[in-house]
């Protein structure tokens, strides 16, 4: 070819064609669609994600569980005795081993080696491995703030000695690590219970909550990263779920399995999966939640967060929490005002919170996310992020943040012994529920004081008017107490388009117990709801209202093909 320009043009064209072929090949060569990732360990992740790995180290996730050794054990094992309900236990060292001398499964005192520790703040728990492979969590725990031993008694039996054959005894099934705790404290847990020998051979990839608990197993991601391709895989993306997707559902539902009260629908959940394909959250049932949806029992945060306006608006966990340290992203009211950037001075001023700046009452979370103490020393905040409602407290007996704070302050100031008998608001509420007249009177008195204060603050305002409107607390309270207006109130909750799905599902469950023609029609209609939790709960509860099996099958059969496993399972049952 004599024309140099033509030669150059051909060379450029050929290079372009070859580059295009190479790029197309690079794109088309993909990992098979059915390939499934395996766990590679956090040390592998750290090679490329060093900053995130170091942020995670020392976090509550990193220290969720550990082997008991000099670096992890916080409790005093220097031959220290602790007595509770007539049982004297002794914590001591045997060389490098941490030991406890306490009542065993047969009721006699014996020595047990502490093999594992749980957590570090505000308490640390200790675990013993029994000969059959069962790992049991001791009720004697270490208060890491007060630096003392305490007995973590079950909330409903605070003053009883637990017999060795009681399921709540530390050797019983309710304190069994494999059944009650393990999958949320370790990564890739395999319980491995052998039915023939009735023994456990439990294994995990990593002892703590590591990278792959939240991001999913990383082998495909590592394989793709090491391939140095110009593209991520056309089948598997970058080999991990996209938790930063615009839809907050993917992130929230990756946290939910371990931060919710739920039961399993199907095994082997992996991050990025649909929560309701693997779990069903507990509804706002009596004993778990107060009638207005505030947390009561140890329900964690997912169920309350589902009720919040924040969830409805797309707020996600990492808007407030650093995902690696788990710490809050901002201190004080900046946590809220970093998003609620309304005209200056609208919220973080006495005109809004009516308290001295810098005091507890001036903190957003104290009013809108009150804490309830669990395990005696562990305060956990309600994530429904609601306005305090002393009016509902007076009317229905539900708690409110104002009464909680002021009642605890009064008990400390008076020092009449109430602060020992009821160290926290939740303890006073529980005492009142058990029939303690003094607790009931004290709570009622402060409730009325708080109602009077808020009525004065918000007289003739929009908030004053809004609080006269029905709240789903009225419906759930009426249903729990069997009041005649329950059906009407529940129907209004179900028909309200702004009702959070978890509340709607709870109302459906109550309507099924009423068993009238109108309530049955509403349950049938709810089987077509856009929310799968509502659909699944409706199916399960329709059976209570359908004496005719043929009618029931006709109504339920189409939902055997529902895209969500929880709904299909409910239909099959």
Regions found by a protein language model. Name each.
Residues 9-23:
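Hydrophobic membrane-insertion alpha-helices, especially the h-region
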Residues 26-29, 43, 51-119, 123-130, ...:
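Primarily the internal scaffold of c-type cytochrome electron-transfer domains
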Residues 36-47:
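Local sequence-structure signature of Cys/Sec-based thiol-disulfide redox active-site neighborhoods
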Residues 483-495, 516-528, 546-560:
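Amphipathic alpha-helical scaffolding segments comprising HEAT/armadillo-like alpha-solenoid repeats
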Residues 497-500, 530-532, 563-564:
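Short inter-helical turns and helix N-cap capping residues of alpha-solenoid HEAT/ARM repeat scaffolds
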Residues 507, 538, 571-572:
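Conserved hydrophobic register position within alpha-solenoid helical repeats
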